[in-house]
Amino acid sequence: MTYISQSDIENVYGSANVAAWSDLTGGDTADSTRITASITYAEHYVENLFRASQYQVPFASGASGYDTQLVDWMSAIAGDWLYRSRGVRRRISRTAVDVGDGTGLTSETIARVRQEMGAALSGKIRLDAALKSNPMAEGPSCVF
């Protein structure tokens, strides 16, 4: 099931960044294979995170499409995957560290996404998504 597209990722990070981050040759031509891989990763990540929640997974599309917050989260995660998986390294004090070390271009966006997903999982915010008929059926249980 596909929830997001390249244009959704571009809405979060910009088309120039998505093209540059997806092109491992150092150019600025979007690599559709890597973009598809980032979409697959992001969609599976969010689905797996919500699988044991009160929400039905896969998520159901409403009359106006998928919940805009879900689309934003998946798009942000897909863009972060593209950014972190570029294989680019930088030097600091003669030690190579990953560019995606928490100081990268996507770190603030991902911090926001994690906070919002945590709020949805804890019930502090409610998504426009179908709920399971029995949310505890797949969650942990205790028998005495």
Segments (PLM) and residue ranges:
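Short loop/turn elements at secondary-structure junctions
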Residues: 76-144
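Conserved short "hinge" loops at termini or chain/domain junctions
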Residues: 1-68, 125-144
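Alpha-helix boundary/N-cap detector
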Residues: 33, 37, 69, 73, ...
